């Protein structure tokens, strides 16, 4: 199994990226939270920490910003009822620090708000998260700081970030507007984008 891939970020879309390394293009599934951070790194060298899921007909790569995030994903998919898609949805909804806080507070409702997770699954997840997550992921100020940069126009910056992930301008405008309508006027881009992505996923699951 690969520990990481270092190469040129050549392509991004919602939930996926392509890294070119030694003439090969690796298609990797990754959390949208991280892809938004990478939107300014297109055609530059990046490091992706990978996890491989072996299926009957293919090997699927999942990518993360750090070994810690990858270990969290590995732990999540080891739980009953949680596959790679749901594991990514959890990491896409919550930062590592937030997930740790949720586990410590035993906030089942927060876990149940993740697309693809029902109340019963959330209750089962909480038992394991409460036991394992605080040891694996001590609170890290860097994880929070990476999402705290505030830019002049959250609306414009949010639309640009979603456009970099492949969303059309009308879709991006709608997603950002819906998210901002649920948040305080002084909400930061870091608060707006996860809500926009979450609401969009919920809408797709209902359709």
From Swiss-Prot:
Q: Where is this region: Domain II?
A: 66-144
Q: Which domain of life is it from?
A: Bacteria
Sequence segments annotated as region (Domain I)? 1-65
Q: Which biological process annotations from GO are given for this protein? A: DNA recombination; DNA repair
Record GO terms (molecular function): ATP binding; four-way junction DNA binding; four-way junction helicase activity
Q: Where is this region: Domain III?
A: 155-207
Q: Which CDD domains match?
A: UBA_RuvA_C
Keyword annotations from UniProtKB, A to Z: Cytoplasm, DNA damage, DNA recombination, DNA repair, DNA-binding
User: Assembly and partners?
Assistant: Homotetramer. Forms an RuvA(8)-RuvB(12)-Holliday junction (HJ) complex. HJ DNA is sandwiched between 2 RuvA tetramers; dsDNA enters through RuvA and exits via RuvB. An RuvB hexamer assembles on each DNA strand where it exits the tetramer. Each RuvB hexamer is contacted by two RuvA subunits (via domain III) on 2 adjacent RuvB subunits; this complex drives branch migration. In the full resolvosome a probable DNA-RuvA(4)-RuvB(12)-RuvC(2) complex forms which resolves the HJ.
Q: What is known of its domains?
A: Has three domains with a flexible linker between the domains II and III and assumes an 'L' shape. Domain III is highly mobile and contacts RuvB.
Function in brief: The RuvA-RuvB-RuvC complex processes Holliday junction (HJ) DNA during genetic recombination and DNA repair, while the RuvA-RuvB complex plays an important role in the rescue of blocked DNA replication forks via replication fork reversal (RFR). RuvA specifically binds to HJ cruciform DNA, conferring on it an open structure. The RuvB hexamer acts as an ATP-dependent pump, pulling dsDNA into and through the RuvAB complex. HJ branch migration allows RuvC to scan DNA until it finds its consensus sequence, where it cleaves and resolves the cruciform DNA.
Can you name this protein?
Holliday junction branch migration complex subunit RuvA
